[in-house]
């Protein structure tokens, strides 16, 4: 909470390939030491690998019945957004000191914070995976998130479990 004035949010330009602000934010989260072109290469490569895997899964489910191909760029973005939605938390716990005790108070997460947390968790989970190369790690983690499994989804489940366990302290909320 600023003392002087509210600081305006910086406008993020959409990414050059898919024209998506969400993807541009994700690239910025993935970026290390200002090397954006490398982060873009990793992200776009991971998305193409993810798209191939999803198409293979859907083709196996349909048993070869072709329904027509959807727009590649739109399909990839939909898969990415669905993976991100599966990781985004809706509640989290925050420490609140009351008297001499510190309580973990469950609080609802704002929309923009939940997106940021989801992106951060996906990147962290991808970095700890065992595959060779960040592109394959990120593709694997995005696929796991798309299928509602994996480390990032587990992190969200743990956060929700913690909030559920501390529901008794919800009346200590300060807003």
From Swiss-Prot:
Q: Which SUPFAM superfamilies match?
A: Ribosomal protein S7
Offer one example of a GO biological process linked to this entry. translation
Residues annotated as coiled-coil are none
Keywords, in A-Z order? Ribonucleoprotein, Ribosomal protein, RNA-binding, rRNA-binding, tRNA-binding
The record's GO CC annotations read:
small ribosomal subunit
Q: Which domain of life is it from?
A: Bacteria
Q: Which GO terms describe its molecular function?
A: rRNA binding; structural constituent of ribosome; tRNA binding
Q: Which CDD domains match?
A: uS7_Bacteria (cd14869)
- What NCBIfam families does UniProt report for this protein, alphabetically? rpsG_bact
Similarity annotation:
Belongs to the universal ribosomal protein uS7 family.
What interactions and quaternary structure are annotated? Part of the 30S ribosomal subunit. Contacts proteins S9 and S11.
Q: What does this protein do?
A: One of the primary rRNA binding proteins, it binds directly to 16S rRNA where it nucleates assembly of the head domain of the 30S subunit. Is located at the subunit interface close to the decoding center, probably blocks exit of the E-site tRNA.
- What is this protein's record name? Small ribosomal subunit protein uS7
This chain's source organism reads Legionella pneumophila subsp. pneumophila (strain Philadelphia 1 / ATCC 33152 / DSM 7513)
